[in-house]
Amino acid sequence: MTAIRVPRRRASADLQGGFDFSRPDEIVCGVDEAGRGPLAGPVVAAAVILDPARPIDGLDDSKALSAKKRDALYDLIVARASAFCVASASVDEIDTLNILHATMLAMKRAVEGLSVLPTLAQIDGNRCPTLTVRAEAIVSGDALVPSISAASILAKVTRDRMLVDLHERFPVYGFNMHVGYSTPQHLAALREHGPCEVHRRSFAPVREALDLMAGSR
């Protein structure tokens, strides 16, 4: 695994698709995750191989985009990518493995689920999962490499939609508003109602809410 730190700028035109034209035999997939920090729900990862013949304008780090723009780009990525896969690691896996290892597992599942076998996986961040293909970590890759940007959008939109669905089952927590992050509203609901089955018990605020509920009995 290699880790690359590059200046924060957009990738060149030669890197706009899933093929690196300076290395014409490469099939490159971008990989990113969503949901490492929240107190509830799975961590989701996506892998994307872009089609250089079907470019997508406006790709960027999902966190820099509005929800409306993310949704529009999500549809374009799904329609135009050469291949993509979205995968996750469950709350139980997060609590058993820890969030870092669960994130690596979700990324591995996403890459292995691609219908096209890449020769290189470019991972956002400074760590790579263990893969059967070559991998390199790119710091701030979600803002620099279009295929990683695309992966960040698929992962973020997918996870946000999962949490909106979970809101229907557990409405007292407001998952539709904060998608599991530790907002004041979420923390107050945790203290009042205690955790539900989709809360990550390995995370300190959830453990504290459990202790509070146990102490009040």
From Swiss-Prot:
Residues that coordinate or bind a divalent metal cation: D32, E33, D124
Protein name: Ribonuclease HII
GO cellular component terms attached to this protein's record: cytoplasm; ribonuclease H2 complex
Catalytic activity from the UniProt record: Endonucleolytic cleavage to 5'-phosphomonoester
EC number of the protein: 3.1.26.4
Cofactor binding, note field: Manganese or magnesium. Binds 1 divalent metal ion per monomer in the absence of substrate. May bind a second metal ion after substrate binding.
Compartment list: Cytoplasm
Domain RNase H type-2 residues, every copy: 26-215
Similarity comment: family membership: Belongs to the RNase HII family.
Species this chain originates from: Burkholderia ambifaria (strain ATCC BAA-244 / DSM 16087 / CCUG 44356 / LMG 19182 / AMMD) (Burkholderia cepacia (strain AMMD))
Keyword entries, A-Z: Cytoplasm, Endonuclease, Hydrolase, Manganese, Metal-binding, Nuclease
The keyword RNA-binding is annotated on this UniProt entry: no
GO biological process: DNA replication, removal of RNA primer; mismatch repair
GO molecular function, one term: manganese ion binding
Top-level taxon of the source organism: Bacteria
Pfam family, one: RNase_HII
EC class: hydrolase
Lineage: Bacteria, Pseudomonadati, Pseudomonadota, Betaproteobacteria, Burkholderiales
Function, in words: Endonuclease that specifically degrades the RNA of RNA-DNA hybrids.
